[in-house]
């Protein structure tokens, strides 16, 4: 597993404890109580490190190569999966994976952005950057869910929509705008979970729904820290400062009313205990479906409309205090 800078001390401590345990099998160097003390110290070290992460360190956790992706969530929390492909206009976009799933016996249409896990799959998936046909594919599956009366789950994980010339020629901006319009009035419950990066229009084009959640170390922002740093300061070394200023993590966005729920991750991030994360996300999806399923469609759409209309309130600070 690739190590992040803040993880090195923890891993060294874990290796030392493992070595002591191995040597103890031959010679009793430490008693079991002494090893337990070392393990308690390790737990305290983890708590100290991971409770004081900077926003930029959390972005690094979010981008960890071993972080679970959409295909992992499908495998880890769904009993069944029937994949559907294509946008019925141009081609299939591998950056979007979707189809019929069953979660705890309930059928959903699940649609997720997929980055890939190695060089070959990342190239195939275009690093999770959707083309217009990806947004059309997502909308097609959403409309199919509406037709059959099934709730929709979106899993968001993208560095942004693909900015290439071919995507622009095929109407990238229009495809995103069309999704915003159509998803805002999709007549079925829509649940969104940001499982990794949620960057710019690439994320927003699949994130209009009735309940929006984020994993603890995921981020959701108008731009990446690198993009912000390059525009504001023309200096890529300002990534950390940009990450702090953007207020891109769950606790900030919940306060702003942009998301509804922050889903806890294991200490160190989702890649340290994927099974626990699958369980937490599954529990959230079922809980929200139970809350939304009995609402009349008119009420559901009205609440969704009001939810997104209320986004955009802000506060400025002057010498005399906060101003609305």
Curated annotation (Swiss-Prot):
Highest taxon in the source lineage: Bacteria
Major location category of this protein: cytoplasm
Record's keyword annotation contains rRNA-binding: no
GO function terms (MF aspect): acetyl-CoA carboxylase activity; ATP binding; carboxyl- or carbamoyltransferase activity
Record-listed E.C. numbers: 2.1.3.15
Pathway, per record: Lipid metabolism; malonyl-CoA biosynthesis; malonyl-CoA from acetyl-CoA: step 1/1
Residue ranges of every copy of the CoA carboxyltransferase C-terminal domain listed in the record: 37-291
Gene Ontology biological-process entries: fatty acid biosynthetic process; malonyl-CoA biosynthetic process
Cited SUPFAM superfamilies: ClpP/crotonase
Location in or out of the cell: Cytoplasm
Keywords, comma-separated and alphabetical: ATP-binding, Cytoplasm, Fatty acid biosynthesis, Fatty acid metabolism, Lipid biosynthesis, Lipid metabolism, Nucleotide-binding, Transferase
Catalytic activity: N(6)-carboxybiotinyl-L-lysyl-[protein] + acetyl-CoA = N(6)-biotinyl-L-lysyl-[protein] + malonyl-CoA
One GO cellular component term noted in the UniProt record for this chain: acetyl-CoA carboxylase complex
Keyword hit for Chloroplast: no
Database matches in Pfam families: ACCA
Role, per record: Component of the acetyl coenzyme A carboxylase (ACC) complex. First, biotin carboxylase catalyzes the carboxylation of biotin on its carrier protein (BCCP) and then the CO(2) group is transferred by the carboxyltransferase to acetyl-CoA to form malonyl-CoA.
The protein's assembly and partners: Acetyl-CoA carboxylase is a heterohexamer composed of biotin carboxyl carrier protein (AccB), biotin carboxylase (AccC) and two subunits each of ACCase subunit alpha (AccA) and ACCase subunit beta (AccD).
Recorded family membership: Belongs to the AccA family.
Record-given protein name: Acetyl-coenzyme A carboxylase carboxyl transferase subunit alpha
Lineage: Bacteria, Pseudomonadati, Chlamydiota, Chlamydiia, Chlamydiales
Gene: accA
């Amino acid at each position: 597993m690739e190590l992040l800078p803040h993880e090195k001390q923890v891993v060294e401590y874990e290796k030392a404890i493992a070595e002591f345990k191995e040597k103890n099998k031959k010679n009793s160097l430490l008693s079991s109580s002494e090893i337990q003390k070392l393990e308690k110290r390790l737990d305290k070290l983890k708590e100290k490190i991971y409770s004081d992460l900077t926003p930029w360190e959390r972005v690094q956790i979010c981008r960890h190569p071993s972080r679970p992706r959409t295909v992992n969530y499908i495998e880890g929390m769904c009993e069944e999966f029937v994949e559907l492909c294509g946008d019925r206009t141009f081609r299939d976009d591998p950056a979007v994976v979707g189809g019929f799933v069953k979660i705890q016996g309930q059928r959903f249409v699940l649609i997720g952005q997929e980055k890939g896990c190695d060089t070959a799959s990342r190239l195939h998936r275009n690093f999770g950057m959707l083309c217009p046909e990806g947004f059309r594919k997502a909308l097609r599956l959403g409309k199919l869910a509406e037709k059959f009366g099934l709730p929709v789950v979106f899993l968001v994980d993208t560095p942004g929509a693909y900015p290439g010339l071919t995507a622009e020629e095929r109407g990238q901006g229009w495809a995103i705008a069309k999704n915003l319009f159509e998803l805002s009035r999709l007549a079925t419950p829509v649940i969104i979970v940001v499982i990794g990066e949620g960057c710019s229009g690439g994320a927003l084009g699949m994130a209009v729904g009735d309940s929006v959640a984020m994993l603890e170390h995921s981020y959701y922002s108008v731009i990446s820290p690198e993009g912000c740093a390059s525009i504001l300061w023309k200096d890529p070394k300002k990534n950390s400062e940009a990450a702090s200023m953007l207020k891109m993590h769950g606790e900030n966005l919940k306060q702003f009313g942009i998301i509804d729920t922050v889903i806890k991750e294991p200490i160190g991030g989702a890649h340290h205990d994927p099974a626990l994360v699958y369980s937490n996300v599954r529990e959230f999806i079922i809980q929200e479906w139970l809350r939304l399923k009995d609402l009349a469609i008119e009420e559901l759409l009205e609440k969704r409309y009001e939810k997104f209309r209320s986004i955009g309130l802000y506060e400025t600070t002057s010498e005399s205090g906060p101003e609305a």
